[in-house]
Structures are given as structure tokens and as C-alpha cells.
């Protein structure tokens, strides 16, 4: 269908909360595979892929069929009930990866928020089971975090504390306390900020994506 780009942008500016800068004069209408098309018929190679989430590309027929069938069957039940698709997908993910369990969420920032909670819960239980002498030595469960310079972990309050760029963090301070930044790809730098009994979790990206693509050394 025909899309009026100017009207779309006027409506965006008038009714959508402006939290993200969008490309001016570009209204994307549809895609196929690695290609996107705008309202004027221009064709683009989609190098962003929804910021690294559209792994099957746009308009994948099999994926569209599965989504449509599920939408016609059962849409959402919350976590209060068992459902077969969730159980089957978790089983497949675990059997084909390193993980022992699967956790489903909506975004990377939500995954990182959950990771902080998982780590804190783990160290809380670990501390609770310690001998009294060990509890007196450590004083409290480990809660601190470590992430790396130039890393990006999300824009919610916990994940934002792990994110390097000050321009992202400054307007929302004070953030979650207790995070230290190490130099990416430098184990000695990481060793200086990882503290026994205090550091609960270390966040590291196999390849950083802020300002380019920077893979870590294998070691």
C-alpha cells in the first residue's frame, strides 16, 4: 500500500515519545531477506538487521507461517502456566548449546538485568550457606559487577551502569552502584578490578559493536 512518508514522520514526531534518533526522510515499508525498501521504492542492504536480531532476514516465509499459526492458537499466558512451545524450544536450545537452562526475555538489556539478578541470587544463597567464620570474613554476599570500556549492555538502569559511554549514563545518574570498567582484551586490567568475595559477575562481549566491530582475542 502507498505510504505518505511526510505524514508518517509528522505522526511519529507528534505521538511517539522521542527517545531515539531516526533517519530523516526514510520510512521503511517492507523487506525481503537482507533487503529493505522505503516508501519511495529505494532498496537497501540491511546491515543493521534490527540491531543484530533479524537472523533470518525479512519476510521469511517459514517463520511467518509459524508466527501466524501460534497467533491463531494461543497468544500469551504469562509465566503462570506451562505451554508446549516454550518447553520444546527450551529443550532444543539447551541440547544444542552450552547452557543448562533457557531464560526467555524480550531484549538484550532485559537479559543483562536478569543476569545481575541471577548473579546476586547465586551469591546470596552461597553466602547464606557459608560457615559463620566465612560470613564474618566476607561480611556480605558479592554484589559488584565488572564490564569493559567501550562496551554496550543496554539502556535500562542496571544495564546502563554496565555501559561505557558517559553520554548514555550521565543524564540518569545515580545508577546501580558497584560496577568497575576494565580494558577490553586486557586480562591484567580485568584482574585488577575483579575482587574475590565482592565481584558477583563479569560482563564481556565476544565482539564489541559500539563504534565498529571489535572482537576480543581468543585468550
Explain the meaning of each model-derived region.
Residues 38, 46, 70, 110-113, ...:
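Acidic active-site catalytic centers that drive phospho-/nucleotidyl reactions
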Residues 5, 29, 60, 82-86, ...:
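Generic structural signal for well-ordered, non-membrane alpha-helical segments
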Residues 25-46:
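Active-site and channel-lining beta-strand-loop segments
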Residues 42-44, 50-80, 84, 88-106:
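Glycine-rich phosphate-binding segment of PLP-dependent enzymes
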Residues 1-31, 80:
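Active-site-adjacent loop/helix segments that line or gate small-molecule/cofactor pockets in enzymes
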Residues 91-201, 210:
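PLP-dependent aspartate aminotransferase-fold enzymes
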Amino acid at each position: 500500500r502507498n505510504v505518505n512518508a511526510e505524514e508518517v514522520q509528522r505522526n511519529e514526531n507528534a505521538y511517539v515519545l522521542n527517545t531515539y534518533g531516526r533517519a530523516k526522510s526514510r520510512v521503511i515499508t517492507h523487506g525481503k531477506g537482507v533487503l529493505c525498501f522505503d516508501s519511495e521504492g529505494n532498496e537497501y542492504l540491511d546491515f543493521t538487521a534490527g540491531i543484530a536480531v533479524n537472523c533470518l532476514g525479512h519476510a521469511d516465509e517459514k517463520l511467518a507461517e509459524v508466527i501466524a499459526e501460534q497467533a491463531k492458537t494461543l497468544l500469551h499466558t504469562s509465566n503462570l502456566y506451562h505451554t508446549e512451545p516454550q518447553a520444546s524450544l527450551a529443550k532444543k536450545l539447551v541440547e544444542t548449546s552450552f547452557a543448562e537452562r533457557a531464560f526467555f526475555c524480550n531484549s538484550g538489556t532485559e537479559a543483562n538485568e536478569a543476569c545481575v539478578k541471577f548473579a546476586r541470587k547465586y551469591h546470596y544463597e552461597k553466602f547464606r550457606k557459608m560457615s559463620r567464620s566465612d560470613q564474618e570474613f566476607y561480611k556480605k554476599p558479592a554484589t559488584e559487577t565488572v564490564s569493559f570500556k567501550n562496551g554496550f549492555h543496554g539502556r535500562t538502569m542496571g544495564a546502563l551502569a554496565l555501559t561505557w559511554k558517559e553520554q548514555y549514563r550521565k543524564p540518569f545518574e545515580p545508577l546501580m552502584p558497584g560496577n568497575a570498567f576494565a580494558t577490553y582484551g586486557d586480562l591484567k586490567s580485568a584482574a585488577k578490578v575483579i575482587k574475590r568475595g565482592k565481584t558477583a559477575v563479569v560482563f564481556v562481549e565476544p565482539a564489541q559493536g559500539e563504534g565498529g566491530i571489535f572482537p576480543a582475542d581468543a585468550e
